[in-house]
From Swiss-Prot:
The keyword Cytoplasm applies. This is 3-phosphoshikimate 1-carboxyvinyltransferase. Keywords: Amino-acid biosynthesis, Aromatic amino acid biosynthesis, Cytoplasm, Transferase. Belongs to the EPSP synthase family. PANTHER family: AROM/DEHYDROQUINATE SYNTHASE, PENTAFUNCTIONAL AROM POLYPEPTIDE. GO terms for cellular component: cytoplasm. GO terms for biological process: amino acid biosynthetic process; aromatic amino acid family biosynthetic process; chorismate biosynthetic process. PROSITE patterns: EPSP_SYNTHASE_1, EPSP_SYNTHASE_2. Its EC number is 2.5.1.19. It is found in: Cytoplasm.
Amino acid sequence: MEQLRLEPISRVNGSVTLPGSKSLSNRILLLAALANGTTVVENLLDSDDIRHMLGALQLLGVNVSLNQERTVATVQGVGGVFKTPREPLFLGNAGTAYRPLTAVLAAVAGEYELIGEPRMEERPIGHLVDALQALGGDITYSKNKDYPPLKIIGGQINGGEVAIDGSISSQFLTALLMAAPLFNGDTKITIKGTLVSKPYIDITLDVMARFGIEVEHSNYATFTVKGGQQYQSLERIMVEGDASSASYFVAAAAIAGGEIEIKGVGAKSVQGDIGFAKVMEQVGAKIDWYDERLVVRKGQLNGVDIDANAIPDAAMTLATVALFAKGPTAIRNIYNWRVKETDRLHAMATELRKVGAEVVEGHDFIEITPPKHFNDVAIDTYDDHRIAMCFAMVAVGGKPITINDPKCTYKTFPTFFNVLASVSE
């Protein structure tokens, strides 16, 4: 297994330009493919999850050309008419590709099979499939009920009224919303339970609106989408920088001192994970806000007790910031960490204890008391990009650390360790 040794970093200084947002990149690619006309997508993220979406779209007959850096894509939309692929669509462990494609392919004519990595077969999709079947969708499980892989015969959905559980993953609702304009009739979606990660739904609604589709909702409890609609291409669309990726550099400046300018997200960001910067201000970081950039400096860091339901991905970074804060930190309402790339709640608790922290792992919360003494250990990353990037913060705090399987960061931020080195002193 490959390992990366990170020596202590005394301070950070410089400027970071963020890669494009994963959440936005895959939503935009899919809607550009479904649209009538050609869309140029700029600042596209080049990562494993995006490559899985691009590979699937090309098998579905969508013509996509990329620049040499793979950050600008020219997508020739097919107007909602895909060809039946000759082979299964392999989507790795990319939930932002697998879930929306499940719903969209159920809505358009053709026969499709969606497969993925072993971890994808452990990530639940039953709530989405139940909703699509209730609307007339023809979807069968190839192995285990409620989990991928799936076989789909598309074009059977007429619309109607359906309820979907919002408490596990917002990606189920995102998938339904993106597919609903393609259904033959109008659709009313009612949310059961508490909707998690609500800001990710705002991203979905924002992107749909830019491609010409309006969704009515009553305070996120019900959503109404007219059927028989067509997405309209945009000449050009810019992918905002990834706010989840920004969290590591906000944290680095807050922990180590120095000053980091983060370009690509700011006060005008549409991503919920920008809320991490507001949490870090509560912790003690000093942040200057501009429309499309942040400037972050160190402050006296104190433990906090927060509900992180709106920022689940970025909140992981807070768990390693907690190692360097004064007093304990509690991160609550994060059950959906358990159904991500790995069971992140258990994984983070395990690795934080290795470093020397006292940790309480609850059903949907984690409490962290900083170490009295830091252990020089190798961090297992569980094939989870965010765990690798989070624990790099230990080195930023002036303690040596080893990261196992550092290339797992290729899922969202292939150049992460190089970028961190470029601002480290």
